[in-house]
Amino acid sequence: MPRRRVAAKREILDDPKYGSQILAKFMNHVMESGKKAVAERIVYGALETVAARKTGTDPLELFEKALDAIAPLVEVKSRRVGGATYQVPVEVRPSRRNALAMRWLVDFARKRGEKSMALRLAGELLDAAEGKGAAVKKREDVHRMAEANKAFSHYRF
């Protein structure tokens, strides 16, 4: 065990437009090479596209609904017991749930075919809010993997 003190968690400031802390965190996930202004433009552009396509809905509410649809409840972790490696299902703590959801959302948005990243992100957000899309499929795959390895749940960490 390291003897050094654990670094204190830095407070994340709310994003300037919507005043949401979770959206500010999401912008940090979208950001590449420290270019925060570009990340902000992408995220706000995606939310404007979502608002234009789904009139009458608050884009921030839809964003949070999409994150909930993507966030996994359980995942598997490898545990080595007597020469065999077992995939042990474990519950995901809330902070990791959000982090995984954001990471998957950005990763699968980058793999989409639309022209700009803002349009890709908007498309993935709309799909996730409706319960479809690649990010939601990833969550279902993770849940299926945990369900298949339920027999090893007594090897908890």
Swiss-Prot record:
SUPFAM superfamilies: Ribosomal protein S7
Gene3D superfamilies the record matches: Ribosomal protein S7 domain
Domain of life: Bacteria
Coiled-coil residue spans: none
One of the record's GO cellular component terms: small ribosomal subunit
Pfam families in the record: Ribosomal_S7 (PF00177)
PROSITE patterns: RIBOSOMAL_S7 (PS00052)
Quaternary assembly: Part of the 30S ribosomal subunit. Contacts proteins S9 and S11.
Family to which the UniProt record says this protein belongs: Belongs to the universal ribosomal protein uS7 family.
HAMAP family: Ribosomal_uS7_B
Function: One of the primary rRNA binding proteins, it binds directly to 16S rRNA where it nucleates assembly of the head domain of the 30S subunit. Is located at the subunit interface close to the decoding center, probably blocks exit of the E-site tRNA.
Protein name: Small ribosomal subunit protein uS7
Organism: Pseudomonas fluorescens (strain Pf0-1)
